[in-house]
């Protein structure tokens, strides 16, 4: 395993995140404030699309530094983002109305909980009139780690 075990540390709720705030999308001009129109903002860049993906039966199976800047992802599978890997044929759905899908023993996480690694290449276009940029993930299901150009953020 190549990542810190934050997923078993109850003292770590977030790391390297911005303080909580009201949800809004910045824009250089006045626009409709409905969330359905957020893509119309010239200061929002969606990272939706086809990402490189690897599925593992356990986080302990992740041994390669897939997050390095020049890591070869040619043999990775591809998956649509946003999506749920269970809908793409990886693993099984975890919801159930019968019993909890894995043992409950906080803060410990079973070693056989599946995980996925994602890689995506994009170009960020800096806007001099909006000097701060934020990376926002909406819908990540559990603990996750982010690297940009090989650097942990």
Name each model feature, range by range.
Residues 2-21, 26-38, 52-56, 84-88, ...:
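Accessory beta-strand-rich segments of carbohydrate-active enzymes
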Residues 37-40, 62:
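Short secondary-structure capping/turn segments at boundaries of alpha-helices and beta-strands
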Residues 39, 43, 67-68, 114:
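Generic detector of ordered secondary-structure context
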Residues 43-54:
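Mature N-terminal segment immediately following signal peptide/propeptide cleavage
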Residues 44-45, 79, 120-122:
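Generic detection of short hydrophobic beta-strand segments and adjacent strand-loop junctions
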Residues 48, 73, 118-119:
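Hydrophobic residues on conserved beta-strands that form the core of alpha/beta folds
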Residues 52-58, 65-94:
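Predominantly extracellular/luminal regions of secreted and cell-surface proteins
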Residues 99-106:
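Surface-exposed acidic, glycine/proline-enriched linker/cap segments
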């Amino acid at each position: 395993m190549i990542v810190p075990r934050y997923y078993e540390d109850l003292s770590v709720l977030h790391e390297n995140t911005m303080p909580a705030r009201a949800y809004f999308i910045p824009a250089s001009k006045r626009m409709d404030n409905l969330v359905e129109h957020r893509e119309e903002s010239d200061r929002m860049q969606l990272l939706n699309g086809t990402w490189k993906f690897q599925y593992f039966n356990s986080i302990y199976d992740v041994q390669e530094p897939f997050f390095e800047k020049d890591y070869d992802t040619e043999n990775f599978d591809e998956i649509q983002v946003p999506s749920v890997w269970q809908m793409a044929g990886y693993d099984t759905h975890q919801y159930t109305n019968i019993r909890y899908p894995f043992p409950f023993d906080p803060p410990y996480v079973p070693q056989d909980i599946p995980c996925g690694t994602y890689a995506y290449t994009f170009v960020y276009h800096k806007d001099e009139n909006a000097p701060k940029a934020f990376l926002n993930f909406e819908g990540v299901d559990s603990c996750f780690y982010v690297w940009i150009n090989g650097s942990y953020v």
